[in-house]
Amino acid sequence: LEPQTRKLFEVCRMREIPIFTFINKMDRPGQEPLSLLDEIEAELGLLTWAVNWPIGSGEQFRGVIDRKSREVILFDRAERGRQSKERHLKLDDPELTKLVEGELLDKALEELELLEIAGSTMDLELIHSGGLTPVFFGSAMTNFGVRPFLDAFLQMAQGPVARNSNDGLIDPLLPNFSGFV
């Protein structure tokens, strides 16, 4: 984890600001997803809940499984900077076995089962208080996984709340209020 990431997480946790995590560059070699979740939990003191789960990584990255819908979003390798085309299939669609190697899909499903048994549970209150971070996997350079991240953020994030300042409580609905940074 980068030093600036650690500092940002520390400030967010101190102020009980929700943290949404996007694990990037799944289309490049890197750490195993389970060890990344362990690292976030151990080093940042945050519980994690994977919203989606990668099928493979690096050259073998094939897409993600959405845990809630049980839908597979397949990754189509695009040139750098270009948007990846996404293909959505249900987990039980027979065509999936033609598009994704069995061992990659089996490994992803085994890891998902492990998360269901031993991982954190989805808890919106804990997300809002900054104690649990929803985790998404993808490749920002090709925009793969970015849309589901943004959609889930809109569903899970709470609206603006009043904040204390040197001048007292600032209501986000005041006409002259423009933002809180």
Each language-model region and where it sits:
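Structural and coupling elements of P-loop NTPases
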Residues: 1-181
